[in-house]
Amino acid sequence: ADSLPDAWGQLLLNRMLKKYKQNLDDITVLDRLAIIGDSGMGALSYHPKISFPQEHLNDDLDELASQCHKILNMEYSEKLDELYHLGGTSGGARPKIMTEIDGEPWIIKFPAHVDGKDAGKMEYDYAVCAKACKITMSEFCLFPSSCCPGYFGTKRFDRKSDKQGTKRIH
């Protein structure tokens, strides 16, 4: 169960399965792990993997955040496939994407219903405070937004990139 997505990833996965006319009652834990394949968090990957078609990926964070809110509101989102591919296997309750910036793997988080629009800035401020207190932190950044003070992002600690590509750490 530790490898299965939490609230946000589970919501995206269930919406994807419904989109592709799959009965959720027929989907087993092993099916869900196969869908995660090698895109999950941490060191584990699952084979044989089952995948959904992948659409063009958008780099407009404000648009992705808006589409996350639609999904959280149980509304239709034309970006469901994209959001699933960017973060549907991630843990946690909050919407997020996993992406690459300058060849390095990052996680960028978006506010959920219970968060204010300044959630990203607040998390960034907490990370700055933790670093000032000499707490070891992954590299982090506040990504700009025209809709809110910004989106918190952190370099993934479970991946390492080099000339041969991205490798799992653990």
Residue ranges and their predicted role:
Residues 1-170:
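Phosphate/dinucleotide-binding and metal-coordinating scaffold of catalytic cores
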